[in-house]
Each structure stands twice: as C-alpha cells, then as structure tokens.
C-alpha cells in the first residue's frame, strides 16, 4: 500500500517536532502504553525503560523512519508496479538494517500482529497529547505507522516460518534443560542447554546469533522477564551454550547465577539475530539468490559471503562478555577451515583485569588444535603484580588497534580485513572511532551493541 503525497508531507513536517521533544516523547508513550496494557510488561525489558535506553532507541528509529519515508514509499511503489526497485536499496540500507534488527528482536520475544495495533493506538495518542491535535496529521501518522507495521509483520512472519521450517526448529518457546552449569570466574557462568525431550535436535544457529530466555518467578519478580544471550558454541544440532555475566543490577543475570542449576528447565526461543558470520557454500548461495524476493533478502544476498572470500582476513574484537558471539564465529571457522585456512584471523580481547578475563583456555585450545596461525592479542585495563606480559596479557591499558602493527600491514597491503566487534557501549564507541580513523570501509565494519541501540552493521 503506497502512501499519498499529503501523508508523506504531514509526517515529514512533524518529524522535527517529535525529535525536539527528545526522549520525553517516547518515555510518555511507554508510560501510557505499559500503564494501560499491563500484559506488555511481560514482553518489554523494564530495566531498559528505567535507564531510558529503550525510549532513546525508539525515538531515534521513529525520527529516522519519518525522514526516510518518501524514499521508502518510492521503493514500494516501484515494487508494486513490477518496476526495477532494487536500486533504492543502497541509500535505504541503514533503514532496512534497523528494521531487520527490530524484526529479529521481535521474533525472539514472540511479538504478534495484534500487538502492533496496541502500539499504534498509544503512539497516535501520544502524538495527539504532545505534538498536535490536527486530525489530518494524526490520520497521516496512522497511515505511516500502518505502513511500517505491515512491513515488519511480513518480515517477522518470514523469520518465524524459516526458523520453524528448519530441521530442529520451532516457533515461540520450547522447554530446555540445563545439562551443565559451570562457573567461569567470579562474574561469569556458562550454561549448556539441551531439549527437555531427550534425543530431540535443535535448529543450528548462525555463528553470532542469540537465544532469548523467558523467566517467570513470582516470588522474585512480578512480571515475566525476557533476555537475549549470545550463543558461544559452534553451530550444531544437539545443544546451545551461553555465558551470562552477573550484573549487579541485572534481574535475570542474577537469577540465572543464583537460582538456576544443572537439571533445571528454562523456556527458550529459537536462535535469532542479524549479526552473524555469513558462510554459504556455492549451492547454498545459489538457492539463497533464487529465493531472494523481499528487500531484506536482497540486502542479505549482497552481504559478504566468507565461504566465497576464502582469503579475506577476519578480525574478531571483543570487550568483556562481548566475546561470546565471536567465540561462536571462531569455533565455526575452526570447524570449516581449520589448519587449511588461507585467511589471517585475529582474536583481540579487552578485559578489566585477568581475574575477570574469560575463555582464555578455550581460545588457546582452538589455536593449538585447529588454527595455529590465529593471532591472539589481549589488553588489560589493570595489570596485577602476578600478571605476566606475553602470557596473561599483551598490552596494558584500554584497547588501541594502533599497537598491533600486523593490522596496519594488512590494511596497507590492500587485504582489507573484516572487523567484527562486540562489547559494552564505551568500548564499541572507541573501536568504531579507531576503525573510522584508519579509513576502514563501511562494508568491512560489522558490529553489534548489547541492548536497544544501533542496528548491527
């Protein structure tokens, strides 16, 4: 359904008014919606409401959509008339990247089409309360929201159906048993999850994706809590492994550390997420290209395929618990390419100190068994008297890519490494700034921020 010129102009004209209100607008929206629809407190991360992370993310997304709505509409007008439309995708890649991340997050928490109607009603009511009471403008925003909701609902159904139809796949949640719980250090526990029904298989995740864990415990918290945790195991059909960092203020992380043990049951959604290492063999790539019909699928088809780029260097950069999705990627590369790999691979990790640094033994074991050329570099913000340079760490202080000369040599030699990085917000900002300063091309920068911030890139 294409939008009229009057609708587009009305939305564009009021986007600035919404942006000027800042997070006060989206905070008012969430307060209204969660007060009048208490059941949604079982879906939304209430901690992100308190810290204003979710209101900020919604504000940014809403304004970006309003400012891009004309070009988005043009794309769908062309598509509806069976005219060439893919040329519009390059300039709209940022919008569709955000939409893809939102769609994956929505499927992980089980969002249904009917819930879009609730959100839309409260969004329009908030616009009426805080921006304008003009009926024509409100009608325009109603049509614009319906347009966006329809786009997301269709994409989410594609994701639901693809996952459910895969071997070992399912929709919504499934009961898993904690087969093993192990303490990694004073702040991190790892969990191996297997289907509660013995012998059942699980859908293989893409290396870098996450699981959503659904937790109910009325004695400890009033509402259901849902959290996403990156999968750290290599793709397989038997189990998933996650690691949970115990956050002092984290409701679910503390619950998993203190109240969940081996043998306990958890409700788990399938693996989702748009941040992953894409690795399609020739036949798989051809099938994906043939099936690409939606704008999302076409954009995915343009993403780098590391099965085809056999010599492209890969640099995995992590801060703290951010290494878990990258560990899945590293294990996958060890399985797929191993000692025969033709590409340079770097594992760069930053930790506060050696006491909270995790998974050193796993990375060392992968290097010894399968990837002897793996270059491992460790930064410790604080070095203890017992730490040994070259063994426990390589550099003291915060991460600084300029201290790794091999990267500069690769870049100077036009090898154009691909950089994957994950970690806390400050860490992510620092790494991205360093890569931009090194003039690393956009298509070589791939990241995911924990929480509702940017889209994966």
Swiss-Prot record:
The gene is hmpA-1. It comes from the Eukaryota. The record marks 30 as: Involved in heme-bound ligand stabilization and O-O bond activation. This is Flavohemoprotein-1. One of its GO terms (biological process) is cellular response to nitrosative stress. Belongs to the globin family. Two-domain flavohemoproteins subfamily. Monomer. PANTHER family: FLAVOHEMOPROTEIN. Residues 171-278 form the FAD-binding FR-type domain. Its cofactor is heme b; FAD. Gene3D superfamilies: Globins (1.10.490.10), Nucleotide-binding domain of ferredoxin-NADP reductase (FNR) module (3.40.50.80), Translation factors (2.40.30.10). FAD binds at residues 210, 227-230, 449-452. Flavohemoprotein involved in nitric oxide (NO) detoxification in an aerobic process, termed nitric oxide dioxygenase (NOD) reaction that utilizes O(2) and NAD(P)H to convert NO to nitrate, which protects the protozoan parasite from various noxious nitrogen compounds. Therefore, plays a central role in the inducible response to nitrosative stress. May also be involved in O(2) detoxification. Residues 168-456 are annotated as: Reductase. The active site is at residues 116, 156. It comes from Giardia intestinalis (strain P15) (Giardia lamblia). NADP(+) binds at residues 320-325. Its EC number is 1.14.12.17. Keywords: Detoxification, FAD, Flavoprotein, Heme, Iron, Metal-binding, NAD, NADP, Oxidoreductase, Oxygen transport, Transport. Residues 2-157 form the Globin domain. Heme b binds at residue 106. The record marks 105, 448 as: Influences the redox potential of the prosthetic heme and FAD groups.
């Amino acid at each position: 359904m294409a939008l009229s010129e009057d609708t587009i102009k009305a939305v564009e004209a009021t986007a600035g008014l919404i942006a000027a209100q800042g997070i006060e607008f989206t905070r008012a929206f969430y307060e209204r919606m969660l007060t009048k629809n208490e059941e949604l407190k079982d879906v939304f991360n209430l901690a992100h409401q308190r810290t204003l992370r979710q209101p900020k993310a919604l504000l940014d997304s809403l304004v970006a959509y309003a400012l891009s709505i004309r070009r988005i509409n043009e794309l769908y007008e062309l598509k509806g008339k069976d005219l060439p439309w893919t040329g519009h995708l390059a300039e709209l890649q940022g919008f569709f990247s955000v939409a893809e991340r939102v769609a994956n997050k929505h499927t992980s928490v089980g969002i249904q089409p009917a819930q879009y109607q609730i959100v839309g009603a409260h969004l329009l009511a908030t616009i009426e309360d805080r921006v304008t009471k003009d009926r024509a403008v409100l009608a325009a925003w109603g049509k614009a929201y319906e347009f966006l909701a329809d786009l997301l609902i269709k994409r989410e159904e594609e994701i639901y159906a693809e996952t459910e139809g895969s071997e070992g796949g399912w929709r919504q949640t499934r009961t898993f048993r904690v087969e093993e719980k192990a303490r990694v250090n004073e702040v991190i526990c790892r969990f191996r999850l297997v289907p509660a029904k013995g012998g059942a298989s699980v859908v293989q995740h893409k290396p870098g994706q996450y699981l959503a864990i659904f937790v109910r415990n009325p004695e400890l918290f009033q509402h259901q809590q849902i959290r996403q945790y990156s999968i750290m195991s290599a793709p397989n059909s038997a189990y998933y492994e996650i690691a949970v960092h115990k956050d002092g203020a984290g409701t679910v992380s503390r619950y998993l550390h203190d109240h969940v043990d081996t043998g306990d049951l958890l409700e788990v959604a399938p693996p989702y997420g748009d941040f992953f290492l894409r690795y399609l063999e020739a036949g798989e790539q051809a099938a994906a290209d043939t099936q690409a019909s939606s704008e999302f699928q076409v954009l995915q088809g343009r993403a780098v395929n590391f099965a085809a780029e056999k010599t492209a260097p890969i640099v995995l950069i992590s801060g703290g618990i951010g290494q878990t999705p990258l560990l899945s990627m590293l294990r996958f590369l060890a399985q797929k390419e191993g000692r025969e790999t033709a590409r340079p691979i770097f594992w760069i990790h930053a930790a506060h100190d050696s006491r909270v640094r995790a998974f050193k033994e796993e990375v060392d074991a992968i290097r010894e068994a399968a990837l002897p050329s793996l270059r491992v570099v460790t930064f410790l913000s604080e070095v203890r008297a017992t730490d040994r340079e070259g063994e426990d760490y390589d550099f003291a202080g915060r991460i600084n890519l300029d201290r790794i000369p091999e990267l500069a040599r690769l870049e100077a030699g036009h090898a154009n490494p691909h950089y994957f990085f994950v970690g806390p917000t400050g860490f992510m900002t620092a790494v991205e700034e360093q890569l931009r300063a090194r003039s690393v091309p956009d298509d070589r920068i791939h990241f995911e921020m924990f929480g509702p911030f940017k889209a994966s890139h």
